Curated annotation (Swiss-Prot):
The keyword Aminoacyl-tRNA synthetase does not apply. GO terms for biological process: succinyl-CoA metabolic process; tricarboxylic acid cycle. This is Succinate--CoA ligase [ADP-forming] subunit beta. One of its GO terms (cellular component) is succinate-CoA ligase complex. Pathway: Carbohydrate metabolism; tricarboxylic acid cycle; succinate from succinyl-CoA (ligase route): step 1/1. The gene is sucC. Belongs to the succinate/malate CoA ligase beta subunit family. Its EC number is 6.2.1.5. Residues 9-236 form the ATP-grasp domain. GO terms for molecular function: ATP binding; magnesium ion binding; succinate-CoA ligase (ADP-forming) activity; succinate-CoA ligase (GDP-forming) activity.
Amino acid sequence: MKLHEHQAKTIFADAGIPVPDSRLATTVDEALDAVDEIGYPAAIKAQVHVGGRGKAGGIKIATDRDEAEQYAEEILGMDLKGYTVDQILVEQGVDFVDELYVGVTMDRGEGQPVLMVSTEGGVNIEEVAEENPDAIAREHVDPAFGLHPYQARKVVYEAGVDADVALDVASILTTLYDLYEENDASEIEVNPVMITSDRDVIAADAVMNIDEDALFRHPDLAEMAEESYEDDLERKAGEYGFDYVRLSGNVGIIGNGAGLVMTTLDLVDYYGGKPANFLDIGGGAKAERVTKALDMVFSDENVDAVVFNIFGGITRGDEVAKGINEALEQFDEIPKKVVVRLAGTNAEEGMEILNTDLVEVEETLEDAVQRAVKNAEEVTQ
């Protein structure tokens, strides 16, 4: 579960991490009331779960009331990488002289949490990791012993952080690790940490992702879950128990098993398409769940074509086929072309059940993906 920036900053502030004064607004009038209280300059920030908000026009700095009104009007309701902005954070501007990145995530290769610090703050850290990996200092933490204070100081100094603010940055990093551990987070970061001319250290942004399977241990975070969903599709996925991630492409993808869905995503990209989503219906999916999955994908206006990839183990091909037929029979006109590939348990029975007037059937995954990509291209031409 991804927390919004304002939610994560509330948690950070409660833990003692310095954050700018801010107010949440859902209307232009609320935004103007907020800047009247906070003063100028003020950052007007879209609250959506996407990276690169600034480059996409989702963050603006207002220096007076007219600009604040203009930017609030522009950002509220805008489409930001497929998400509609319905709330903004109005935040006190920070006069900074330097920017850093600090974060904690799980290194799955090592099976341990890893602290990360870089003086390349304020930019996409994934790009830094790819283009200049040495610019990120790392320190693994043995979960059996926890974080030792010297480890935070060590990784901060190794990153080349100025000595006069290094201890303050190490303190923020230590607190982030504590929050990471206490809240069953999968990722927590600040990008950027801003250093002011007075050498104050301020968390100007906040990212905090929580393991949804651990929410039963955190009722306070569970209460944030409803607000953290960006749209009805994510909300539906949570209700249905699907693993769902919305992407920016136009080829809808449904499968059973995370690995199978990821393989399908890779093939869509390989054959020149753009995946619109990751949707795993899980093992043993009955017709009802398949119907719900198709309904979800059809509801995404960005989807132009759908590929359904099922390998039967626990999931029976005949049940999946029934679900596909039931879902498609609900429509007077099929809204998107659907390509189906079935293999494994009861796959032959499933292929016979499928109504080929409603779907296109392919025997191999490669053929199914190529047809779906072609179908999507035909819609956009």
